[in-house]
C-alpha cells in the first residue's frame, strides 16, 4: 500500500485528523493517536490490543512486529507496508481505530 492510499484510508474514519508526530504522520481520533506512517521506511504503526498484536505478529513475524520496549508492550505494532496485502493493513487499521476511538464512533466499524 502506498502512503497516499494509507492516508486516505486513515482519514476515512469518523473524526480523524492528521498531524505531524516527529518524522512521521500521525492519525488521531479524540486527540489520541491510533496510527502513524513513516514514509521513508514505508512502515505503519498501529495501536492494537495484546490479543490482536499477537495474532498479527504470529501471522508474519518478518513483516509485523511489536514496537521496541514499553511501546510494544502497550500494543504498538509495526507493519511493513511493502510486504502485506491491503486487506490485512485495512483490517489492522480498523482494529486500531476501534481500539482508540470512543465507543460512539467505533461501533459502526466493528464486525
What role is predicted for each listed range?
Residues 1-111:
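Charge-dense, helix-prone N-terminal extensions
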Amino acid at each position: 500500500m502506498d502512503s497516499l492510499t494509507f492516508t486516505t484510508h486513515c482519514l476515512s474514519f469518523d473524526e480523524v485528523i492528521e498531524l505531524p508526530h516527529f518524522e512521521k504522520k500521525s492519525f488521531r481520533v479524540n486527540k489520541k493517536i491510533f496510527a502513524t506512517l513513516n514514509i521513508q521506511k514505508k512502515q505503519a504503526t498501529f495501536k492494537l490490543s495484546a490479543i490482536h498484536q499477537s495474532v498479527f505478529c504470529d501471522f508474519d513475524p518478518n513483516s509485523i512486529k511489536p514496537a521496541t520496549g514499553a511501546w510494544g508492550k502497550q500494543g504498538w505494532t509495526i507493519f511493513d507496508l511493502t510486504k502485506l496485502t491491503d486487506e490485512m493493513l485495512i483490517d489492522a487499521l480498523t482494529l486500531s481505530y476501534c481500539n482508540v476511538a470512543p465507543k460512539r464512533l467505533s461501533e459502526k466499524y466493528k464486525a
